[in-house]
Regions:
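Extracytoplasmic beta-strand/coil segments of soluble accessory domains associated
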Residues: 78-116
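Short acidic/polar hinge/loop motifs at secondary-structure boundaries
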Residues: 116-143, 245
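Periplasmic-side early beta-strands and strand-to-turn transitions of outer-membrane beta-barrels
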Residues: 178, 194-285
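C-terminal beta-signal and adjacent terminal beta-strands/loops
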Residues: 212-215, 520-521, 525-527, 655-730
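Gram-negative outer-membrane beta-barrel transporters
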Residues: 370, 375, 411-416, 515-518, ...
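Surface-exposed extracellular loop regions of Gram-negative outer-membrane beta-barrel proteins
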Residues: 431-436, 449-497, 516-550, 630-635, ...
Length: 730
């Protein structure tokens, strides 16, 4: 029997057993107390910048809770999002995660940590290993343009990572160690202190993997012989570590101040083979990041909140040479004279890019008469880029200032019925592109307790980055390839529409949302004739091909997201499905015309499934077990083949041990990709997934907390304090 048929048969049996188990549960007598209810109703803050119960938020918000994170036991943020949210797709490589949300890529997704932007990229890809999965309290996902609140980048949506806080008087000590296949190591440590008005939380994380090779076959070009012994890995060996510190001082009941910072380093080890154009690598990739922040929260009265923040971040990307490397060099002052090489020796480091960003913000939430809530603020951002080998002149800068205001209105009518409106405007002033006004409007109509209808219209606005404007990079790959920026680029804009319905009753939650996103003047790299490039570059580099950033694409995405969740006694079930269709008007360089194509990476169908069981065997032992599945149809690309469809299933268990007043012992163990699916597509072609096949993991967490819970009065807006929206579980 073919492998695909065997896989399908096994999956049908698993689903049948799960349905039988669910039916047996339903046959038992039902009572109101049988349904699992949160002791604290879920609250969200990302969509509007103000705190709301999830069921009453005017904008559809997807939440991955702390309990879901613990049950799933994901090894990374990519693992968590792909396993628990079907709208996401990833395709990891050395340049990043290549994340997509509802068809649009990383450049259009804004990632926040406690409301602050994650900064730094390589090739437009954020380094998600900056985020320690063990330090996540919950994840809030808002889809569609959010530029009225967050500015550029938020055309596809916003992911807000809300981290854990030390809220208890006394001492907190936590260690979490996890080991898995391919020498996968995940280490997390935390030390928390809270005495009186002062608190400190220190976090350390370390991650390592030996990487893996799913195939040794390399795609070759032209008439070259196939390569069957390539040394390239599907995922390279890598290590990274980060240490962070957060200090908080409560001046009085009205004012709280904070300061914090992080230091991060990462290295990607690239094996070297014998085929010069394919698997010979003479340098590794290295990253050095740092951040510092300070600010505070002020409550002028019992209802209003003002926050002020100053943030600085640095992201440095460099080559670490592992073998003598002869780099082709040119000396412009001597005209067309060609100098064949410039040597780099082992252990030398060459800076590729050094990005630094400074942001200042002032935000306030004010209660107004007649059920209105005003959220307003001002921001300033300064970007500095140093890339001697990659931008014209070696450096580039950019600045953006913005003011925004949003008003929310609530009106209760009838029995348990609610109308919630939110409208906002953002005025952005960019140093290179002038002013732009972007609006957003959302409405939620609650019809009794179970029914909610939501609608949103919003515009997005994204200015070209300094890299897209000033890029100049030469790459040796079967000849010289020249990549150029374009100072004539226009900002990208979008219009986003969504309409959704929600039904929630007696442990059952069903949510269906349809959306349409139209993006104008998309920026992408296109091949141009050499004569269109600056003559001095053609003389200097003599490229075989020249590519330049241009506004050539208009894109549209349309789709439907469906989520079903049901909780009964100790059981929970979930099903997610995402249907997506995309098209773009793309420049065809070979025929010098526009053509209609699908957006790269699009999968028309994606889904996930989970069922979990939680049971306490007396005061000293509790078990949580879950089966999770994620599926994707074919991912389509214009070049280098399509990514294969797949389905991957996972078993995860957690075991809470002991009955100690101050110490928590938790063991995690599980099997990922239990059906052992591997995509062995040759290197150089697109993959559906990079999974190495069946893998195993085990982990131990020890948490010691000597203190008592204290009440936090600073329920602020989006800035730095989310304690009111988190649960009390460590």
């Amino acid at each position: 029997m073919p492998v695909q048929e065997q896989t399908g048969l096994i999956m049908r049996k698993i689903i049948k057993l799960l349905l039988i188990g669910a039916a047996l549960c339903l046959l038992q007598p039902l009572a109101a107390q049988d349904f699992l209810q949160d002791s604290i109703p879920e609250t969200v803050i990302t969509a509007t910048g103000t705190l709301h119960l999830l069921k009453d938020a005017p904008v559809q918000t997807e939440v991955i809770s702390r309990q879901m994170l613990q049950n799933y036991s994901g090894r990374s943020l990519e693992d968590i999002l792909s396993g628990l949210a079907p709208s996401f797709a990833f395709n990891e490589d050395d340049m990043g995660s290549h994340m997509q949300l509802n068809g649009l890529g990383n450049n259009y997704i804004l990632i926040l940590i406690d409301g602050k932007r994650i900064h730094g990229d390589v090739g437009g890809e954020n380094d998600l290993s900056l985020i320690d999965p063990r330090n996540i309290e919950k994840i809030e996902i808002v889809k569609g343009a959010s530029s009225a609140l967050y500015g550029s980048d938020a055309i596809a949506g916003v992911i807000n990572i809300i981290t854990r806080k030390h809220k208890e008087e006394g001492l907190l000590l936590e260690n979490s160690s996890r080991y898995g296949s391919y020498n996968d190591i995940r280490q997390h440590n935390a030390i928390g202190l809270k005495f009186g008005r002062f608190s400190s939380l220190t976090n350390f994380q370390f991650q390592h993997s030996d990487g893996w090779q799913n195939t040794s076959v390399e795609r070759t070009v032209g008439t070259e012989k196939p390569i069957t012994d390539s040394q390239n890995k599907t995922v390279n060996r890598h290590s990274n570590g980060q240490i962070g510190e957060q200090l908080t001082f409560t001046v009085n009941d009205r004012l709280e101040l904070y300061a914090g910072g992080t230091i991060y380093a990462k290295r990607i080890y690239r094996p070297s083979g014998k085929y010069a154009q394919y698997d010979v690598h003479t340098y590794d990739l290295q990253y050095h990041n740092a951040s510092a922040s300070a600010g505070g929260t002020w409550k002028p009265n019992d209802t209003d909140v003002v926050t002020f923040d100053l943030d600085w971040t640095r992201h440095a990307y460099m080559y670490y040479f592992t073998a003598t490397t002869l780099v082709e060099d040119y000396e412009k002052s001597k005209g067309t004279i060609y100098y064949p090489y410039f040597p780099y020796l082992p252990d030398q480091i060459e800076m590729q890019s050094d990005q630094r960003r400074t942001m200042a913000s002032l935000k306030g939430v004010f209660t107004l008469p007649a059920g209105n809530l005003l959220n307003t603020g001002a921001e300033y951002r300064y970007d500095w880029l140093s890339a001697p080998n990659r931008v014209v002149g070696g450096k580039a800068t950019d600045w953006t200032a913005a003011v925004y205001a949003q008003d929310e209105f609530k009106y209760e009518f009838g029995r348990n019925s609610l109308l919630h409106l939110a409208g906002g405007l953002r005025l952005t002033w960019n140093g290179s592109f002038g002013m732009k006004l972007t609006p957003k409007f959302s409405a939620m109509l609650g019809l009794g307790l179970p029914w909610r209808i939501r609608a949103t219209w919003s515009q997005g606005f994204k200015t070209p980055t300094p890299k897209e404007l000033e890029y100049r990079y030469v790459k040796q790959m079967s000849g010289t390839y020249l990549y150029l920026g374009n100072t004539a680029l226009r900002p990208q804009t979008s219009n986003y529409f969504s309409l959704g319905g929600e039904y929630t009753h007696a442990g059952l939650s069903i949510n269906v949302t349809g959306y349409y996103n139209s993006v104008k003047d998309m920026i992408t790299l296109v091949t141009i004739p050499n004569y269109q490039a600056p003559a001095e570059y053609i003389i200097q580099y003599d490229p075989v091909k020249t590519r330049q950033y241009q506004n050539v694409d208009d894109a549209r995405t349309i789709g439907v997201d469906v989520s079903v969740r049901y909780s009964l006694r100790e059981w929970a079930f979930g099903l997610g499905y995402s249907w997506l269709d995309t098209d773009a008007n793309q420049y065809d360089s070979s025929h010098d015309r526009m053509r209609n194509v699908i957006i790269d990476g699009t999968a028309h169908h994606k889904g996930n499934f989970f069922t979990t069981w939680n049971h306490r065997f007396g005061p000293a032992y509790k078990i949580s077990a879950g089966i999770y599945g994620r599926m994707s149809s074919t991912r389509f690309y214009q070049d280098d083949g399509n990514g294969k469809g797949y389905q991957i299933w996972r078993i995860s268990t957690t075991h809470d041990l002991g009955n100690f007043e101050r110490t928590v012992w938790r063991i995690e163990a599980g099997v990922d990709n239990i059906l052992n699916y591997v995509d062995r597509t040759p290197h150089g072609l697109h993959l559906g997934t990079t999974t190495p096949g069946r893998t195993f993991y085990i982990g131990l967490t020890v948490n010691f907390n000597s203190g008592r819970k204290v009440r936090n009065t600073f329920n602020s807006t989006i800035s730095n304090n989310y304690n009111s929206s988190t649960n009390d579980e460590n």
